[in-house]
UniProtKB/Swiss-Prot annotation:
Chief location of this protein within or outside the cell: membrane
Topology in membrane: Multi-pass membrane protein
Record-level Gene Ontology MF annotations: transmembrane transporter activity
The protein, known as: Guanosine ABC transporter permease protein NupQ
GO CC list: plasma membrane
Origin superkingdom: Bacteria
Function text: Part of an ABC transporter complex involved in the uptake of guanosine. Responsible for the translocation of the substrate across the membrane. May be a nucleoside transporter of broad specificity but with various affinities for different substrates.
CDD domains cross-referenced by the UniProt entry: TM_PBP1_transp_TpRbsC_like (cd06580)
Gene assigned in the entry: nupQ
Length: 319
């Protein structure tokens, strides 16, 4: 097996598992850059996965190929609305942001399973009729070598996730809006003095995290899980949180970290096809992403400094 064949197996599989992590981690970047810790990324992914699956089941046959894309829009809307609970608790009521995020995770899982049981009489939905399918990107898939590796067996959602990472970088670091988001996460009092509404910007940051988290959950459900159960997301939001920290709260850093974790997750699927990993028991491959997550969060891979006001409630006029 030559290097091109190996990469043509590794890269598409990595992109499949990395895409939901990229999207969810980007949401965390916006929230935490605005000064609100978001442990609730797992819950936002659960809401997104649940919404996209139900939308696809209810409307998939009528909408056809448009159903998975529209289900992602529904997932984004649901994630944004659900994130308002965390925003209100953390920003308006100045609750402990870590506790609020954990509550979001618990509420999301409990509420979605309750609704699924009401509808289906069991804790699992049917398989969605219109998932996303791997495809060859027109034109790009015909490029020698690179086309076979990157563009011949890929989901459009993977390309979308990578594109959104660069768009997020541009918004955060090259636009006035991004400057305002970052200012309320670093020096909210100075931002307030300059006329920036700290509460408004933090609400926007958390809602953007809801949009991205819902999108990440929807992508995972529409490309990998294809149904919804209590274990559909199963820690993906926490891995995305690790990618956020590992990426040092930067969109491109989060992209790189998510690709790394995506590769680790893909090994359990493609490991037996690769000469280097084929003799390693699959159980170790399943453990790999979680071990790497722990290493990243404990600072083994490098020190990461959060925005200075991250997790600190802002009280107008208090010094």
């Amino acid at each position: 097996m030559d290097i091109v064949q190996i990469l043509s197996i590794i890269v598409p599989a990595t992109l499949v598992y990395a895409a939901p992590l990229i999207l969810t981690a980007l949401g965390g970047v916006f929230s935490e850059r605005s000064g609100v810790v978001n442990i609730g990324l797992e819950g936002l992914m659960i809401i997104g996965a649940f919404t996209s699956v139900l939308f696809n089941l209810f409307f998939g046959q009528e909408l056809g190929a448009a159903a998975p894309w529209l289900s992602l829009l529904a997932a984004m809307a649901a994630g944004a609305l659900f994130s308002l609970i965390h925003a209100a608790a953390a920003i308006s009521f100045r609750a402990d942001q870590t506790v609020s995020g954990v509550a979001i995770n618990m509420l999301a899982l409990g509420a979605t399973l309750f609704i699924v049981k009401l509808i289906y009489g069991k804790a699992q939905t049917d398989k969605i009729p219109e998932p996303f399918y791997k495809t060859k990107i027109p034109g790009l898939g015909d490029i020698p070598v690179l086309g076979k590796i990157f563009f011949s067996d890929v989901y459009y959602t993977s390309i979308l996730a990578i594109a959104l990472a660069f768009i997020s970088w541009f918004i955060l670091f090259k636009t006035p809006f991004g400057l305002r988001i970052r200012s309320v996460g670093e020096h909210p009092m100075a931002a307030d003095t300059m006329g920036i509404n700290v509460y408004k910007m933090r609400y926007i940051g958390v809602m953007i995290s809801g949009l991205f988290g819902g999108l990440g959950g929807g992508v995972y459900a529409s490309t990998i899980a294809l149904d919804f159960t209590h274990s559909t997301i199963s820690g993906q939001g926490f891995i995305a949180l690790a990618a956020l920290v590992f990426g040092k709260w930067h969109p491109i850093g989060a992209l790189g970290a998510a690709l790394f974790f995506g590769f680790a997750q893909s090994l359990s699927i493609i490991g037996s096809l690769l000469p280097l990993f084929k003799d390693i028991p699959n159980v170790y491959m399943l453990m790999a992403p979680y071990i790497l997550t722990i290493l990243a969060l404990t600072g083994f891979i490098g020190r990461a400094d959060a925005p200075k006001a991250n997790g600190v409630p802002y009280i107008k006029g208090k010094r």
